[in-house]
Amino acid sequence: MLVVVTVIGIMAAMTLGALQLARESSREQATKATIAKLNNIILRQYDSYKTRRVPIRIPPGTTPRQSAEIRLAAIRDLMRMEMPERWNDVSDAPGLLPHIGVPLQEPALLQLYRAKYGGTNPPKNPDNFSHAKCLFMIVSMGNPEAMEQFHQSEIAVDPEDGWQYFVDGWGKPIYFLRWAPGCSSYSDIQSGNAATDPDPFDTRRVDPAGFHLIPLIYSFGRSGADNVEVENDVHFRDPNTSPNVPTTICGLSQYQANGAPVASSATGNIHNHRIEQR
C-alpha cells in the first residue's frame, strides 16, 4: 500500500510539474506574439523618419555639412518628441538646432501627448511603468488603427492613475526604449559598430560615432525582475559644457548604458532584438 501511495505521489508531482512547464511555455509564446506585433508597429513608424521631411529653413551661406548636421539634429529631436520613451520626452521643449539656434515647431503628435500627460489624470510620480505607458501612448495615439490587433488580455490599467500599458503573458508591463545603445552586447540586430553599421538617418555621416540603433521592446520574462538600465536621459548637447557641445545620438556617456543588462536574470528577458522573437 505504501508503495502504491508513493508511486501515486511521484506521478502527481510529475504531472503538476509538466502542467507548470506548459503554462510557462504558453506565457512565453503569448509574450513573444505581443512583442512581435508591437515590433512591427514601432519599426514602421521608426523607419518612416528616413524619408520624413522636417519643417526647417536652412539660411543662405550654410555649408552642405552644416545643413546635414541641422537636418540630423532635427530628425533626432522629432523622433524623441513623437516616440517618447520617458515622460521628460513629452514635457521637454524642442531643442535648439545647431548652427541656426532655433528649435523645431512642436509636432501635432507631441501636442496630443501633452494634452493627455497634462490633463486631469496625469501619470503618477514616481512612475516605474513610464516606459511601458509611453509605448502604449505611441501605439494608441500615433497608430490608433493598430489597436485592433490586441486583445484585452494584452492590456492592463494602472489603478493608481488610470494609464494603460501592454502586458506580457505574466500580466507584467512590456517596456520600451526608443534608443538602447547599451543592449548592443546581447542584440542579434544591433551591432553597436559605427563603421560597419552606421546610423541610417545620418546619410552624410556627419556623426562618425553614431551607429544603427533599433528600438528595444522587452519583457522581464519568467523572473519578472527589473534588470535593464533605463535611468539616463538623452541629451543632444552636453549641459556640462559652456557653450553646450553636441553629443552623438547615444547622448552623454551615461546614456550609452541605457538598455544594458544590470543583472544575470536579463538573459531570460523576451525582446525584439532576438531574431527568433521577431
Protein language model regions, located:
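N-terminal single-pass transmembrane signal-anchor helix
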Residues: 1-22
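Aliphatic-rich helix starts adjacent to a transmembrane/signal segment
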Residues: 15-36
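N-terminal pilin/flagellin-like segments and related low-complexity appendage regions
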Residues: 32-278
